[in-house]
Regions:
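Conserved active-site-adjacent core of cysteine acyl-enzyme catalytic domains
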Residues: 21-28, 34, 67-133
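Active-site-adjacent structural segments surrounding the nucleophilic cysteine of cysteine proteases
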Residues: 2-4, 14-69
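Sec-dependent N-terminal signal peptides
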Residues: 6-10
């Protein structure tokens, strides 16, 4: 009996070496599909990448989305004051169907899918975010 117990305890010591998953905190699990904004004016690209991760489960990042934005004559990506139309065109270039709607808060609270929303507390500084009801 003692040999069996020793063998069992010995086996338990090496069990963590064979674990093939990492333990994640609740915050890590909650934010695993979140794409953080890397540049001052790239909230639209980060929000679109987050939305794609949530809906299509593709690992799209912000830089990948920025490649689909309109470029200026020098080939630079313009992220200054991005509109819904530009985000819609980028999504369509990536192969997604998209549409823009204006709705009041009451209708917004009834929607049960993630949405990309433009916040305009100050019209000079619009901001894009993803909301999940």
């Amino acid at each position: 009996m003692e040999k069996v117990l020793r063998f069992f305890l010995f086996s338990l010591c090496f069990l963590p070496l064979f674990a093939d998953f990492a333990v994640k905190s609740f915050q890590e699990l909650r934010n695993q599909n979140l794409v953080r904004q890397s540049y001052e004016e790239s909230c639209g690209a980060a929000s679109l990448a987050t939305l794609i991760r949530l809906i299509d489960f593709k690992r799209v990042d912000e830089l990948e989305v920025l490649e689909y934005f309109t470029k200026d004559s020098k080939g630079n990506i313009n992220t200054d004051m991005v509109s819904f139309l530009e985000l819609q065109k980028a999504a369509q270039k990536m192969g997604y169907k998209s549409a823009s709607y204006q709705m009041d808060r009451e209708a917004l609270e009834k929607v049960q899918i993630p949405l990309l929303v433009k916040i305009e507390d100050d019209p000079r500084f619009p901001h894009f975010v993803v909301i999940i009801n």
